[in-house]
């Protein structure tokens, strides 16, 4: 099962924050008192969003919430999103709730894993079909045109279904304004030693300019590797320049209204469907799209 820790000072603590984390960061008697408050209030096994926890009228629960907010959410969120937790959708901050349990797993899915031969091979196999034609290095706007009452594909009226998964604002040349996204710069480093950090992912929630370090051999379970490779992730604001990738939609009310302008430009075409992170301006995990 996938587990993630956060580097907070000299400690590596499990995230999402759970009862194990609670006992690591508070002294024994205090931790036991706070654990009882959490289980009595929310029930063992519950998942409580940090912004909900901060609204509690109980001083002890607010003390936990303040610790989690300051040491796990605040700086990490500002790095990742360029905004404070209060400024983005609670759908985003709620993705990493406080767990009222002793489960250190980052995900709760019964089955977890990666494709045996990697995602590259998996998608090659998916696309290797006689009914699938792949066209590379082609802007959708070059082959897809919107007329008043129909869609043209390669200059001809097209009555079939069109499923669009790209950035919807760029499909319309950002005519209503560019939808804000966060992008990432991946800095790869290789070391001639068996291990760099002894685990797959370490989040840096109170320090560093990067958000996390991933050490791949702990995800792939490779044993016969020559050294170890890591990657550091540096978030930045997407501008649309060549080479930048719009990874994360910045979900708030203002951006949602802008997205709706673009969505309404497509709703007249009954055979046109928006699907995925970019086209729907949403934050999906890969399992939600299968």
Feature map (PLM): residue ranges:
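Conserved beta-strand termini and adjacent loop/short-helix elements that scaffold enzyme active sites
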Residues: 135-139, 216, 275
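Short FAD-binding loop at a beta-strand-to-alpha-helix junction that anchors the flavin cofactor
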Residues: 266-282
């Amino acid at each position: 099962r996938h587990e993630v820790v956060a580097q907070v000072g000299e400690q590596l603590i499990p995230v999402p924050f759970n009862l194990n984390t609670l006992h690591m960061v508070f002294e024994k008697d205090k931790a036991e008192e706070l654990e009882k408050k959490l289980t009595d209030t929310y029930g063992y096994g519950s998942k409580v969003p940090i912004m909900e926890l901060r609204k509690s009228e109980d001083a002890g629960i607010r003390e936990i919430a303040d610790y989690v907010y300051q040491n796990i959410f605040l700086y990490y969120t500002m790095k990742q999103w360029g905004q404070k937790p209060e400024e983005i959708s609670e759908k985003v901050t709620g993705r990493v709730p406080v767990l009222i349990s002793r489960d250190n797993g980052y995900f709760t899915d019964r089955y977890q894993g990666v494709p045996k031969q990697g995602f590259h091979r998996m998608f090659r196999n998916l696309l290797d079909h006689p009914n699938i034609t792949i066209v590379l290095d082609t802007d959708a706007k070059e082959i897809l045109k919107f007329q008043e009452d129909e869609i043209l594909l390669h200059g001809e009226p097209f009555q079939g279904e069109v499923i669009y998964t790209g950035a919807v604002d760029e499909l319309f040349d950002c005519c209503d304004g560019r939808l804000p996204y966060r992008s990432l710069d991946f800095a790869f480093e290789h070391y001639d030693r068996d291990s760099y950090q002894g685990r797959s992912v370490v989040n840096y929630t109170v320090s560093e300019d990067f958000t996390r370090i991933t050490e791949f051999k702990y995800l792939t379970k490779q044993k016969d590797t020559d050294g170890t490779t890591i990657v550091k992730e540096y978030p930045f604001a997407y501008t649309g320049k060549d080479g930048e990738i719009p990874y994360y939609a910045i979900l708030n009310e203002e951006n949602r209204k802008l997205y709706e302008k673009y969505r309404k430009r497509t709703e007249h075409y009954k055979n046109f469907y928006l699907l995925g992170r970019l086209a729907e301006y949403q934050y999906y995990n890969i399992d939600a799209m299968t």
